[in-house]
Amino acid sequence: MATAYIIGLGRSGIAAAKCLKQDGWEVIISDCATSPNLIPLQQQLHAEGITVKLGHTPNLNASDLPELIVVSPGVPWDTPFLIEARERQIDTIGELELAWRYLQSSPWVGITGTNGKTTTTALVAAIFQGAKLNAPSCGNIGYAACELALSKLKKDNTSNYDWIIAEISSYQCESSQELSPKIGLWTTFTADHLSRHKTLDNYYAIKASLLYRSEYQIFNGDDPYLHQTGLHQWADAYWTTVKGKDNLLCDPSQGVYIQDNWVVAFGELILPLNLFKMPGFHNQQNLLMAIAAARLAGIEKGAIASAIATFTGVPHRLEYIRTVDGIDFINDSKATNYDAAEVGLLSVQSPTILIAGGEEKEGDDKKWIAQIKSKVIKVLLIGEAAENFAKRLHDCDYHDYEIVETMDKAIERSLILGQELKAKVILLSPACASFDQYQSFEHRGEHFRELCQKLI
């Protein structure tokens, strides 16, 4: 019996393990975590014939090498163990690539980008599903991709997929050497994850590899970096713009754009823009890319319009929570870098009280700070980044900030200040990762939502 190592006991790792076990492999999951909370899960998987090694760092013994190693998205591709595995020519892939091996008989839509990919994925899935297609979303949202593969291996009634809609991070691109979508979308590109990918050029090449393998490529022409590369790359691609037909980087027959408050796709009027309820130009960009994918998939414009009219957005992405004393509380916890946080501020009314901070990331904060100076009457700083953010704001001659450290204190203080200063919006848009205080950006956003709902 062939042996597979799974690195990481998260949702995707467990799904990959169950998938391989169903397909007749001997499966060993390795995870460096030692929490007692994992013991019941370890026992449950053992009962299914899957070995789980906790507090374990894998190594490659020449006498007992696996035939396959599957890596969870959070595991760096350049760890010594994985480098050695590839040097020994052991088949080493990510969980998404494993799913592709089982699901490639269905066409895929693959969505990648620094920001915007989650909302775009949700839009694509809503349109395809609204058109009565069996088109589940997976990757960073929806299912783990191998959960879909497992359903197919078990021949479940729901596993006859018309399309697979996959949100694909740079980590997943990096560990997926063969994944080849029918339709590939690239939403935005700015500096992010450089602590992992080292250089901007390397980060770009990792993203681009997915598009090169896609049969059809769709790009956001309003993204400055992608626009610039589009002048000399991607000659046959489909392009979008919110700035009208004259700003397309392709012939209008291959473009999707906004003209006179209508969405036009490949030369045909699709829907009036006022059907789409999400705020911000960035969400209009996401909309155009989703419509481009839908039209390439042959979906009728009536089905597209119906899906868009009922689409309410995605949790943690400019998610409206409630209004208290005329002040809107907005959850933008997914804004884990400066560019996303800048977009968050661009999308809400002013004056705004901003809650920011967390685990600091590298990046250019100038445009974000410019938006703070333009729209924000008070910044409440939380998490590890609070001191550095305070210093940076002070150095940029912005002094309306307070260090409050925790979300609980931020919510309590924000309502008091909002009433005093007549704010229109209290916005959580952290410009940081969440791992200093939370398990994930979702965990952070859920805590924000819970605290907001408790306000009297």
From Swiss-Prot:
Supply one GO BP term: cell division
Give the subcellular location. Answer: Cytoplasm
Its domain of life reads Bacteria
Asked if the keyword Cytoplasm belongs to this entry, the reply reads yes
Cellular compartments per GO CC: cytoplasm
Which residue positions does the secretion signal occupy?
A: none
One annotated GO molecular function: ATP binding
Primary location group: cytoplasm
Q: Which positions does UniProt annotate for ATP binding?
A: G113, T114, N115, G116, K117, T118, T119
Question: Any idea of its EC number?
Answer: 6.3.2.9
Q: Does the keyword Coiled coil apply?
A: no
Name the InterPro entries on file: Mur-like_cat_sf, Mur_ligase_C, Mur_ligase_C_dom_sf, Mur_ligase_cen, MurD
Q: In which pathway does it act?
A: Cell wall biogenesis; peptidoglycan biosynthesis
Provide the catalytic activity annotation.
UDP-N-acetyl-alpha-D-muramoyl-L-alanine + D-glutamate + ATP = UDP-N-acetyl-alpha-D-muramoyl-L-alanyl-D-glutamate + ADP + phosphate + H(+)
Entry keywords, A to Z = ATP-binding, Cell cycle, Cell division, Cell shape, Cell wall biogenesis/degradation, Cytoplasm, Ligase, Nucleotide-binding, Peptidoglycan synthesis
What does the similarity note say? Belongs to the MurCDEF family.
UniProt function note = Cell wall formation. Catalyzes the addition of glutamate to the nucleotide precursor UDP-N-acetylmuramoyl-L-alanine (UMA).
The record ties this protein, via NCBIfam families, to: murD
Write the protein's name. Answer: UDP-N-acetylmuramoylalanine--D-glutamate ligase
Organism per entry: Crocosphaera subtropica (strain ATCC 51142 / BH68)
Which taxonomic lineage is given here?
Bacteria, Bacillati, Cyanobacteriota, Cyanophyceae, Oscillatoriophycideae
Task: Please name the gene that encodes this protein.
Answer: murD
